[in-house]
């Protein structure tokens, strides 16, 4: 993102944002409601275009791309996980994933089953959403997001509706994906989710007010504590 601003009428959702995320990074985006977090993830995910500035994704400046091109980039390069599960109630877990495969023109039940195995739900493949817990439904959504082998995995409050146990399971899945080389960008209100990322930015009133490298050790205080 280079000098990115996004304006809706009189609302300045983002103001002059400069942000670089490298391949393989894990970034968390935090901040109060209305600070611009979801707007930022929508721009990165090619679901919206900036009012000014440029968003460059794998060499593509999305502000200059056509709607058809943005759809293709989103289909080929991005996996999306939302707070709401958006599963089709009358389809099984594996069928919900295969619906996403049709979008990517690659229906393959074997690959859909493999994606469910990856998130620990191989034995739930034939279950309907109503037969799954909230945590299991979110894991189906993660499997669905992975089906096109995306370059970037984007999450907008992916643990927002989960209890502590299922939140931990989802975080562990994200850790595994990151170790395998995935680029992960997650919007969250939850400090525990935000703190597991390599890097954390905090937004306020559409501006980045903190940019924290969380891979660096904390400086020891003089009394022996940690800064």
Protein language model features and the residues they cover:
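ABC family nucleotide-binding domain
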Residues: 2-205
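Conserved beta-strand-loop-alpha-helix hinge in the C-terminal portion
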Residues: 207-227
């Amino acid at each position: 993102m280079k000098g990115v601003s996004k304006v809706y009428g009189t609302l300045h959702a983002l103001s002059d944002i400069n942000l670089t995320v490298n391949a393989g990074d894990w970034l968390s985006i935090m901040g109060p409601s209305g600070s611009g977090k979801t707007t930022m993830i929508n721009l990165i995910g090619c679901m919206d275009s900036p009012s000014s500035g440029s968003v460059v994704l794998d060499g593509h400046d999305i502000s200059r791309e056509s709607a058809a091109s943005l759809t293709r980039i989103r289909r080929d390069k991005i996996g999306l996980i939302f707070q709401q599960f958006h599963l089709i109630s009358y389809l099984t877990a594996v069928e919900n994933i295969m619906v996403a495969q049709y979008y990517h023109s690659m229906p393959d039940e074997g690959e859909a089953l493999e994606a469910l195995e990856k998130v620990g739900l191989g034995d739930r493949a034939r279950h309907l959403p109503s037969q799954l817990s909230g945590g299991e439904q979110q894991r189906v959504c993660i499997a669905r997001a992975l089906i096109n082998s995306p370059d970037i995995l984007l999450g907008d409050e992916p643990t927002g509706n989960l209890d502590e146990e299922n939140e931990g399971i989802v975080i562990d899945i994200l850790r595994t994906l990151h170790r395998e080389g995935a680029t992960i960008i997650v919007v969250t209100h939850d400090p525990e989710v935000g703190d597991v990322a390599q890097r954390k930015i905090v937004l306020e009133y559409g501006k980045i007010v903190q940019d924290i490298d969380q891979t660096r050790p904390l400086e020891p205080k003089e009394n022996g504590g940690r800064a």
